[in-house]
Amino acid sequence: MKESSLKLAKKVTVSEITNKISSAKAIAFAEYRGLTVAQLKEMRVEAKKVGVELKVYKNRLFKLATDKLGYDLSSFLVGANIFAFSNDDDMSAAKLLVKFAKKHKEFVVLKAGTFEGKVVDTQELKKVAALPSYEEALTILARSLMAPLQQLSLGLKLVSEQKSN
């Protein structure tokens, strides 16, 4: 007995979602309702800038894919959701959706995501978004390492000036 083309299309979509989740470093998703086309376009442009891929899937198909991979996201998969897949780093997807949810509070509701292979809820998603990026963390580290050296240098300079006087 042959499978219907609709059933085959659904299997292909589930396979696509499974591949996207497997290859993504992190995922975040939010419920969106009432957004204008211009607002969605703005979100997609912003996503492209930060290396995040946005997709809209049926919740049931997304649930089938996440169940295959061992993620229990079923309680969050209600309403019209937009899924953000971050392939470059662990925080871009969360940062994008948190930023957009703040800007459009009445239209976007953060749901959940994955971070370091674990399911995270809305509160944890916000915490992930607040973390500095890799480059920002390196800058903070460099500054904190330079401060004591600068103070030592200044102290030695003052001591040498006092001895010369």
From Swiss-Prot:
- Give the InterPro entries listed for this entry: Ribosomal_uL10, Ribosomal_uL10-like_sf, Ribosomal_uL10_bac, Ribosomal_uL10_bac_type
> A single Gene Ontology molecular function, please?
large ribosomal subunit rRNA binding
Q: Please indicate which superkingdom the organism of origin belongs to.
A: Bacteria
Q: Which Gene3D superfamilies match?
A: 3.30.70.1730
Q: Name one Pfam family in it.
A: Ribosomal_L10
A GO cellular component annotation in the UniProt record: ribosome
GO biological processes: translation
Q: Does the keyword Ribonucleoprotein apply?
A: yes
Cysteine pairs forming cystine bridges in this chain are none
Query: Which PANTHER family has this protein been placed in?
Result: 39S RIBOSOMAL PROTEIN L10, MITOCHONDRIAL
**UniProt similarity note:** Belongs to the universal ribosomal protein uL10 family.
According to its UniProt entry, the function of this protein is described as: Forms part of the ribosomal stalk, playing a central role in the interaction of the ribosome with GTP-bound translation factors.
What is this protein's record name? Large ribosomal subunit protein uL10
> Which organism does this sequence originate in?
Mycoplasmopsis synoviae (strain 53)
The gene that this protein is the product of is rplJ
